[in-house]
Amino acid sequence: MVKAEQFKEWLKKNTTYSDAVIGDTVSRVKRADNCLEIYHDDVYQFYLERDEHYKTFSVAVRSQIKKAVSLYQRFLDE
């Protein structure tokens, strides 16, 4: 389960992203969570990339999701 509100606050505090970009980033994390329930582990990205639903996204969307998940993992580390 994605901690959306806490993640938004973390992004506001730790990045220079606009509110729109923060909203997009949270949305991408939720899309990843819909493919494969998100969990705090280095291998999550590995398994996500092998998910059939994830593979249907365009290369650009997959790249955006990977970046968002990477940020979310950093958020969970703190």
Question: What is the predicted role of each segment?
Answer:
Residues 6-16:
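Positively charged, polyanion-binding regions of nucleic-acid-associated proteins
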